[in-house]
Amino acid sequence: MIIDGKLIAAKVRGEVAEAVRALKASGVAPGLSVVRVGDDPASAIYVRGKRKDCEEVGIRSDEHHLPATVSQADLLALVARLNADPTVHGILVQLPLPKHLDERAVLDAIDPRKDSDGFHPFNVGALSIGIPGTPRPCTPAGVMRLLDEARVDPKGKRAIVVGRSNIVGKPMAAMLLERHATVTIAHSRTQDLAGEVARADIVVAAIGKAELIRGEWIREGAVVIDVGMNRLDDGRLVGDVEYAAAARRASAITPVPGGVGPMTRAMLLVNTIELARSGAR
C-alpha cells in the first residue's frame, strides 16, 4: 500500500477549516505570523506554501520579511512584539537563519504558548515527559497521523528511527514511545544499520542521505515512512529509502515526494488552531 500524504493532508486541511469556522463563530480569528530572514529561494517557496495553506483553511497569515543583515536584537524585538500581540496565536521563524544569528536564542524567545513549530524547549520537554496539550513538532506529528490513517498501531511493535535531529529524529522517537512502540534510534555511528532496520516493524527514515536505506534491508511486511528529501545530480527527488526495492517488501510505504512533506505543512495548521483554542480559554 502506498500511503498518500497529499490525500491525507487534504483531509486534515478540511478538518482544520471546519475548526476555524467554529472558532470564528465564537469570536476567535486564528492568526499565524511567519518571520523570514534574508532571500533564500527555498525559504521563500516554503513561506508561500504556508500562506496558501492558511488562506485555504481561513487562518489569517502575515509574513515579516527581514533583511539578511538584521541584527539579533532587532529580530528578538520583533519576536517580542508578536508574543505580545493578542491577534497572533502562532509564531513561526523560518529556518535556517543567517549564520550571524543565534538560532537557538531566537526559537527560545518565542512564547511556548505561540510555538507553532513545537520547537521551544518547554514544548520539547513536555513531549518527552508526556504532558498533553502542547504543540508537537510538525513532521513527527504528521508521521503519526499517516500511521493512524494507514491503520498502523505502533503498540508493541519494533520501530526504528534513522536520524537523531532535534526537529525530527528525537521527537519522532518520543512520539512512537508514547504510543507504546519499542523504539531504536539509529544514526551515522550505528554499527549495523542494515541489521537494525531488518528487525523493525516500522521504519522512519530521517537522516538526509539519498537512498541510504536499501530495499533488501526492509523486513517483509514492515511499514516504511520516508521523511528524507534529496535532489540527485539528474534533478530527481528521492528519499532516504531505496523506494522501488523497499516497496516490494513493505506492507505500506510513503512516496517521495508526496508522502511526509504535505503532512508537515498540514500539522502546522493543526498546531495553530490548537494554540488559538488554548489562547481563547
From Swiss-Prot:
The biological pathway it contributes to is: One-carbon metabolism; tetrahydrofolate interconversion
Query: Which Cys pairs are S-S linked?
Result: none
Q: Does the keyword Amino-acid biosynthesis apply?
A: yes
Mind telling me which GO cellular component terms the entry cites?
cytosol
**Record's protein name:** Bifunctional protein FolD
Q: Does the keyword rRNA processing apply?
A: no
Its quaternary organisation is:
Homodimer.
Job of this protein: Catalyzes the oxidation of 5,10-methylenetetrahydrofolate to 5,10-methenyltetrahydrofolate and then the hydrolysis of 5,10-methenyltetrahydrofolate to 10-formyltetrahydrofolate.
Source organism phylogeny: Bacteria, Pseudomonadati, Myxococcota, Myxococcia, Myxococcales
Q: Known catalysed reaction(s)?
A: (6R)-5,10-methylene-5,6,7,8-tetrahydrofolate + NADP(+) = (6R)-5,10-methenyltetrahydrofolate + NADPH; (6R)-5,10-methenyltetrahydrofolate + H2O = (6R)-10-formyltetrahydrofolate + H(+)
Classification via InterPro entries: Aminoacid_DH-like_N_sf, NAD(P)-bd_dom_sf, THF_DH/CycHdrlase, THF_DH/CycHdrlase_cat_dom, THF_DH/CycHdrlase_CS, THF_DH/CycHdrlase_NAD-bd_dom
Q: Which PANTHER family match?
A: C-1-TETRAHYDROFOLATE SYNTHASE, CYTOPLASMIC, C-1-TETRAHYDROFOLATE SYNTHASE, CYTOPLASMIC-RELATED
Q: Name one GO molecular function term.
A: methenyltetrahydrofolate cyclohydrolase activity
Report the CDD domains cross-referenced here: NAD_bind_m-THF_DH_Cyclohyd (cd01080)
What does the entry give for GO biological process? Answer: L-histidine biosynthetic process; methionine biosynthetic process; purine nucleotide biosynthetic process; tetrahydrofolate interconversion
Keywords (alphabetical) are: Amino-acid biosynthesis, Histidine biosynthesis, Hydrolase, Methionine biosynthesis, Multifunctional enzyme, NADP, One-carbon metabolism, Oxidoreductase, Purine biosynthesis
What gene name is listed for this protein?
folD
The Enzyme Commission number assigned here is 1.5.1.5, 3.5.4.9
Sites where the protein binds NADP(+): 163-165, 188
**Of which family is this protein a member?**
Belongs to the tetrahydrofolate dehydrogenase/cyclohydrolase family.
